[in-house]
């Protein structure tokens, strides 16, 4: 059952800004020993995120698995999946897809990353309304300053 959905609103519309923010959010959750699924909009986006998770930080990398290429490994804590379909169970779902994922209710926490792209904002508002109508607790966060200046 979903306990909370956090909407992170980014100021720009560059794909790399959303992806970098998703990586940083994933790293933070990973360091707290959480299981994370990053749901991308496409297989191509998942492959780009796959590369970025290895290189986005000079200090570290995030071990992960592309679940669309093979069944989930039980020891893996970070999964990348492309919509559609139900990604593996996890503590946190980072949603970069344009729609609610299948079986979204099984994730205790969901992070929706919304940028300034007009269509993504519109779809994000639709998801916000859906969650709200289903009485899921929601929080909205403005992008942190370092995303605003380095995005």
Describe every region a protein language model picked out:
Residues 108-151:
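Glycine-rich, aromatic-bearing surface loops/beta-hairpins
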Residues 24-25, 53-57, 110, 127-130:
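Short, solvent-exposed amphipathic alpha-helical segments in soluble enzyme
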Residues 50-89:
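Helix-adjacent hinge/juxtasegments
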Residues 37, 92-94, 111:
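Conserved beta-strand elements of the Class I
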Residues 1-46:
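Long, hydrophobic N-terminal alpha-helical segment
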Residues 32-35, 45-62, 134-137, 151:
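Terminal and domain-boundary regions
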């Amino acid at each position: 059952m979903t306990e909370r959905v956090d909407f992170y609103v980014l100021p720009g519309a560059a794909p790399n800004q959303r992806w970098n923010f998703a990586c940083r959010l994933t790293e933070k959750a990973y360091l707290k020993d959480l299981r994370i699924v990053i749901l991308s909009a496409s297989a191509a986006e998942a492959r780009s995120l796959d590369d970025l998770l290895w290189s986005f930080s000079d200090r570290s990398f995030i071990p992960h698995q592309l679940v669309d290429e093979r069944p989930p490994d039980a020891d893996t804590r970070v999964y990348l999946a492309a919509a559609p379909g139900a990604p593996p169970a996890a503590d946190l779902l980072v949603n970069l897809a344009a729609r609610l994922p299948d079986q979204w209710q099984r994730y205790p926490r969901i992070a929706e990353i919304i940028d300034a792209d007009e269509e993504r904002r519109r779809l994000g508002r639709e998801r916000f309304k859906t969650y709200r109508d289903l009485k899921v607790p929601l929080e909205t966060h403005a992008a942190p300053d370092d995303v605003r200046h380095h995005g």
